């Protein structure tokens, strides 16, 4: 019975997400409903002592990353930098390679620190015009955007500032550059397989005589492709803040330990108002601080170099970015609190025991994380639930098998971006809404990319065991 309660809570949350209901509201309802069925008297203590503690802890650690990433992405958009990058990519790579152009631009923006949701809005108008001029069926476009924005630059390529690569740093005391060789190998494999798949789909569909086509939703003015604005910034200037974020992120990862050591004690000598000293283990925040510092410098760079363009839309743009960051952070934090509650239930012991039956530590972690990401429809949410419930188990198993925690970080991060893009995933729903397409028209290609992403993590595990590369 206790096992069925856990399954019911997970199924309820998945259904709520699929139906479009707010996870912020329904994650605590699902968690506390499970507690009510287990021990009615524990509902209030669990809510305050577990759910809210986990939620607040997540927000404390990660909200600045969500906020700075959203603001940076919005400034890249309103400055014209993202538009300039798209136009330059089309000019230099060519319209005949539409899939490669869109994948490259999306990858460049996400690896440079732009939120994947912002990338969808920024790239779509120009992607639509490119596909129209090349007479490539529009319904293939979401697959290309998914490969560029929702895959290797989100969780696999070393140093990516996306939250899916940052969350593991606090659990495993690693950095965003964990397991660089495995990350590069996994990224190349994912990109290569994805491009081959998309090109095969393009040839297959166009062989039937299908062209760009259209949809009823395209009548909506928001979804109409638009011509590039005049007077766009130079492409080299446009790409500079993305490069800056990557370079500063790497530099701070190396420099922060030298500045602060292993632990930093903040005492009343420095701040007389402190009632007691604050001891902060630095290793657990290196990855977060490095990304925050890099994004902050990226924001300053964009404001300074594109002040004329940014000034007019700065107030409204940053207001929208803050709203988006709050929503994204609270969604994931609620799922993290849900995971903490579920992990405390007796029924979860059965789940944990079943997962322990998978003897290999890396496969165990990969299956656990990607399954929960699929159930919740969220890479960061599924990973948060898994790590809230099983991170200690993962660490013990890896250390027992003498597997570096860097490898575990990379596997967990990649696994979170495996089955997350099922039909109820928020990014998938947003992508289809922005492009004016339906699941029936375009989810097939997105699912193909989902399969490639899921298989890639097991390919990387095999590479590690065969070569020992980290």
Task: Indicate residue ranges for each PLM-predicted region.
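Core transmembrane alpha-helical segments of multi-pass membrane transporters/permeases
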Residues: 25-28, 48-83, 108, 281-347
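Hydrophobic alpha-helical transmembrane segments of multi-pass integral membrane proteins
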Residues: 63-69, 92-129, 329-337, 358-396
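Short helix-coil transition sites and intra-membrane helix breaks within transmembrane domains
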Residues: 19-23, 59-62, 73-83, 109-122, ...
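Long, contiguous bundles of hydrophobic transmembrane helices that form the permeation core
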Residues: 6, 38, 181-317, 434-435, ...
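Membrane-core helix-loop-helix motifs of multi-pass transport proteins
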Residues: 128-239, 427-464, 468
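Hydrophobic core segments of alpha-helical transmembrane domains in multi-pass membrane transport
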Residues: 5-17, 28-37, 66-71, 106-110, ...
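Alpha-helical transmembrane segments of multi-pass membrane proteins
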Residues: 96-109, 136-153, 179-184, 188, ...
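Re-entrant/interfacial helical elements at transmembrane boundaries that shape
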Residues: 70, 84-86, 117-130, 159-171, ...
